[in-house]
Amino acid sequence: MDKLLNKKIKVKQSNELTEAAYYLSLKAKRVLWLCLMQTYFTASVSEDDDEMAVLGDSTFKVKVADYQQIFQVSRNQAIKDVKEGVFELSRSAVIFYPKEGSFDCVARPWLTEAGSRSARGIWEIEFNHKLLRYIYGLTNQFTTYSLRDCGSLRNPRTIRLYESLAQFKSSGLWVTTHAWLNDRFLLPESQQKNLAELKRSFLDPALKQINEKTPLLAKYSIDDSGKFLFSIIDKQNPV
């Protein structure tokens, strides 16, 4: 893992998986990230288009020591976080709304099985095989961001906002509404009804964290119709 950390670690999530993972807790997201990082180094990758070409295994090893090192927490905290994150994934399902097929709504559990080797500080996590194509990023569009950059964000809503911004990094513009933000980020009533409160207690501090701690530089304005216009710049590849 030390050798991997010396590289520019990228996590690749299909946009569908990003949508499904929005409402996971921070601990569960981190466990998922550690698995996604392994897909980047184990799946076959085309040098031309950087697209995952071959599915890898459905079982991943999550090490407490890796969690501790990457997210800068104590050993005891890492043990607790990984366990709780794995348990949350094991209880959760991904909801899909397919446009084709027999069903218009499908729930698929994240995991088939998860087992711990406490003495070695390792969890072995087996994902539902029907989710593998999402986990390995085999859809046409996916979000790419640095694991360490994400790890520096602490607030779940800030992370969700970062993920949304990252999806529009290539275009540099994201247009949305107050109603969409309410639904997506499960905003408290005070932020749902009061635009000034939304800006003061969520958007402004969240963007401050994102601008300071990630490769993105984002700001927003509100047009005459009330739509939110987010401009997004990649600091590493500015236009």
UniProtKB/Swiss-Prot annotation:
The Gene Ontology biological process terms listed for this entry are:
DNA replication initiation
SUPFAM superfamilies membership: Winged helix' DNA-binding domain
Q: Which family does it belong to?
A: Belongs to the initiator RepB protein family.
Q: What is this protein called?
A: Uncharacterized 27.6 kDa protein
- Could you tell me the keywords of this UniProt record? Plasmid
Q: Which InterPro entries match?
A: Initiator_Rep_WH1 (IPR000525), WH-like_DNA-bd_sf (IPR036388), WH_DNA-bd_sf (IPR036390)
- GO MF entries: DNA-directed DNA polymerase activity
Query: Which Pfam families does this one have?
Result: Rep3_C, Rep3_N
- What role does this protein play? Mutations in ORF 239 affects the incN plasmid pUC1 E.coli polA-independence but not its autonomous replication ability.
